[in-house]
Amino acid sequence: MMFKQYLQVTKPGIIFGNLISVIGGFLLASKGSIDYPLFIYTLVGVSLVVASGCVFNNYIDRDIDRKMERTKNRVLVKGLISPGVSLVYATLLGIAGFMLLWFGANPLACWLGVMGFVVYVGVYSLYMKRHSVYGTLIGSLSGAAPPVIGYCAVTGDFDSGAAILLAIFSLWQMPHSYAIAIFRFKDYQAANIPVLPVVKGISVAKNHITLYIIAFAVATLMLTLGGYAGYKYLVVAAAVSVWWLGMALRGYKVEDDKVWARKLFGFSIIAITALSIMMSVDFMVPNSQNLLTYVW
């Protein structure tokens, strides 16, 4: 029973979602030549770091979690694990994760993990989430760290491919998170969390969602234009972006914003999973010509 509680406080759903993106970044950089020990070290290392961040987040958010229907039954809110024990647990998870990334992958992968962790726990959870409408934007940077860690674990270098991945996953986070804030509007309002839909209104949030999806669509295409992913990836990226944008535009005419937002959120998961899979299997081999070559 205790094992279940210690697992729940790490938010396994978030860990699983991040692992999909780590695999995407790792296999994109591997280009068919997979170092399996490095692969395992990277996956386990990122999992532990993400788990640590989630436990710290649960500790920090104990007060506001009590006010939200979605989170009122979390382990720390119900007192199933003491706050002190959770801090020790989170610290041990983090140390183990960072050590695996440093010694099993490379220092760059570890430092990227540290930066993502600091942004999520130190900047987003401790301050921005509670005090600024820009909290989601800051948090998106930490959410984009896992695929970049996977990529840089292989390359050992933060190149344009890593920058494109950072852009794709950061931009994806915004409409994904705003959709959650719309269909969980009352929860965020009750907890006094200044997310965009609550502070500026749902209509403004819809405008932001549309603009971020357009920016996301452009960013996804850059992997092929830059010579990192193939044309099958390009087709899938274009298709999911157009469909997601269409869903966003239909939001201006819907009668039930919550139902629409849930559908938009659901498709965001499908979209990022599809892209992660496609970049894993449809990569460009070294020295391949890319479309930007013909432009210049």
Swiss-Prot record:
Gene Ontology cellular component terms for the protein in this record: plasma membrane
Class of enzymatic activity (EC top level): transferase
Pathway(s): Porphyrin-containing compound metabolism; heme O biosynthesis; heme O from protoheme: step 1/1
Places the protein is found: Cell inner membrane
Residues annotated as transmembrane: 10-28, 38-56, 79-97, 108-126, 198-216, 229-247, 269-287
Main localization, broad class: membrane
Residue ranges annotated as Cytoplasmic topological domain: 1-9, 57-78, 127-197, 248-268
Miscellaneous comment in the UniProt entry for this protein: Carbon 2 of the heme B porphyrin ring is defined according to the Fischer nomenclature.
One Pfam family named in its UniProt record: UbiA
Residue intervals on the Periplasmic side: 29-37, 98-107, 217-228, 288-296
Task performed by this protein: Converts heme B (protoheme IX) to heme O by substitution of the vinyl group on carbon 2 of heme B porphyrin ring with a hydroxyethyl farnesyl side group.
Membrane topology: Multi-pass membrane protein
The EC number(s) this enzyme carries: 2.5.1.141
UniProt xrefs under InterPro entries: Protohaem_IX_farnesylTrfase, UbiA_prenyltransferase, UbiA_prenylTrfase_CS, UbiA_sf
Keywords recorded for this protein, A-Z: Cell inner membrane, Cell membrane, Heme biosynthesis, Membrane, Transferase, Transmembrane, Transmembrane helix
Record family assignment: Belongs to the UbiA prenyltransferase family. Protoheme IX farnesyltransferase subfamily.
Gene behind this protein: cyoE
Protein's name in the database: Protoheme IX farnesyltransferase
Paired cysteines (S-S): none
Reactions this protein catalyses: heme b + (2E,6E)-farnesyl diphosphate + H2O = Fe(II)-heme o + diphosphate
Record GO terms (molecular function): protoheme IX farnesyltransferase activity
Any one biological process term the GO annotation gives: heme O biosynthetic process
Organism: Salmonella typhimurium (strain LT2 / SGSC1412 / ATCC 700720)
NCBIfam families: cyoE_ctaB, PRK04375.1-1
